[in-house]
Amino acid sequence: MSKGTSSDTSLGRVSRAAFPSPTAAEMAEISRIQYEMEYTEGISQRMRVPEKLKVAPPNADLEQGFQEGVPNASVIMQVPERIVVAGNNEDVSFSRPADLDLIQSTPFKPLALKTPPRVLTLSERPLDFLDLERPPTTPQNEEIRAVGRLKRERSMSENAVRQNGQLVRNDSLWHRSDSAPRNKISRFQAPISAPEYTVTPSPQQARVCPPHMLPEDGANLSSARGILSLIQSSTRRAYQQILDVLDENRRPVLRGGSAAATSNPHHDNVRYGISNIDTTIEGTSDDLTVVDAASLRRQIIKLNRRLQLLEEENKERAKREMVMYSITVAFWLLNSWLWFRR
């Protein structure tokens, strides 16, 4: 018996020495890991909110207090179904805010928004700010509007004719008709008859004449009509300058030599007479102003495109000349080097 008891005591000592008891910190770490694993498993597998969250370390008194209904032991997790503003003007500390009542009682007016277009094309219609002041519909306005439509259609047809080279032929006819009378020609007069040629002035020249500037047009810039008249006059002036430059550049090509240095007085007299008659006959209606401004704007856009094409052609020609010059210089340098090597 003594041997058995001594052996048991020796085994207990060896086991205690080989496997020491865990400390309090190790026990706390083990419990924390176990709690985290259970918490993660409950969230990931069962997908539910935990019933409670402990706010104090585990203690027997707290557990007993929780069982007795003490609220300090844990916090019950409850997700509310809805959130309502506390108070209905019954409690002074939790009264209903006045801003909420104001927001709910204020009716919201719907806003009519128009989607802007992706592409703005000036050739289809004039700008919207030109139609701010529309006069009341009267028979006179209808007649003026019809005249404006006729002018627009006529200008479009004349643009097509000018693209086909009619302007060059008319210009040559002006110089070849020496027996024609040298007086002022109006759009509303009969065409000039000559023994060989018959020349009819183009109404397109009457549209490119300088505008008739009234003194009140420049001063009355506070109204929309004054702004429209200023835009029209400045646009016509710029367009006339561009046409003069193009005429000067075109004269050496069409007539060449000495004819390019001198201008045609008959042509200048005709243009001057047409400009004077046009300034006296042209009305002051808003519709005609809008039509003229839109047509002049389209013509200026076309001229700008032509000038851009000419500039691009000049740049390409300069590049080609530079490349050819470089190739020529390199060729002669190579030939000279080979000649010196011999």
From Swiss-Prot:
Name listed for the protein in its UniProt record: Mitochondrial fission factor
Residue ranges of coiled coil: 291-322
One GO BP annotation of this record: positive regulation of mitochondrial fission
Cytoplasmic-side positions: 1-322
Topology in membrane: Single-pass type IV membrane protein
Compartment list: Mitochondrion outer membrane; Peroxisome; Cytoplasmic vesicle, Secretory vesicle, Synaptic vesicle
Family, as annotated: Belongs to the Tango11 family.
TM region positions: 323-340
A GO molecular-function descriptor: identical protein binding
Description of how the protein assembles with itself and partners: Homodimer. Interacts with DNM1L. Interacts with C11orf65/MFI; the interaction inhibits MFF interaction with DNM1L.
Effect after changing residue 29 to K: In a colorectal cancer sample; somatic mutation
List of residues that carry Phosphoserine: 155, 157, 172, 202, 229, 233, 295
GO cellular component: mitochondrial membrane; mitochondrial outer membrane; mitochondrion; peroxisome; protein-containing complex; synaptic vesicle
Function: Plays a role in mitochondrial and peroxisomal fission. Promotes the recruitment and association of the fission mediator dynamin-related protein 1 (DNM1L) to the mitochondrial surface. May be involved in regulation of synaptic vesicle membrane dynamics by recruitment of DNM1L to clathrin-containing vesicles.
Superkingdom of origin: Eukaryota
